[in-house]
């Protein structure tokens, strides 16, 4: 299951003992919906090696500004609470898997 993040739990949830993948999305974005389906599947396959979360930047504008989100979907790849990589737009699952491997 992918955790929904808000300003209240964001900083705690991105500090995991494994790589963290955060999808920054909006509710009316078709590309975001497609990517969410991909991430749901990947989160089940990789639940022991990566932590998946998402954040609606329509409602969490502080997070949108903090990470300078200008397009959605945006994926943040985080290790030790620090963003190590960012991908924008629809992304192939293999690219996401490779970026997770780089964080280990």
Show which residues each predicted segment covers:
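Conserved helix-turn-beta segment immediately C-terminal to the redox Cys motif
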Residues: 16-19, 36-55
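CheY-like receiver
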Residues: 12-13, 63-66, 99
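Non-catalytic, surface beta->alpha helical segment in thiol-disulfide oxidoreductase systems
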Residues: 79-104
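Conserved redox-active cysteine motifs that mediate thiol-disulfide chemistry
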Residues: 24-38
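Structural micro-motif
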Residues: 61, 67-76
């Amino acid at each position: 299951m992918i955790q929904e993040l808000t300003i209240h739990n964001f900083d705690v949830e991105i500090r995991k003992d494994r790589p963290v993948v955060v999808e920054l999305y909006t509710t009316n974005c078709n590309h975001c919906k497609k990517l969410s389906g991909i991430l749901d599947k990947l989160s089940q396959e990789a639940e022991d090696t990566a932590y998946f979360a998402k954040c609606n930047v329509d409602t969490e504008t502080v997070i949108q500004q903090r990470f300078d989100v200008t397009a959605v979907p945006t994926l943040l790849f985080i290790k030790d609470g620090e963003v190590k990589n960012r991908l924008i737009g629809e992304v192939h699952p293999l690219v996401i898997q490779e970026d997770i491997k780089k964080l280990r």
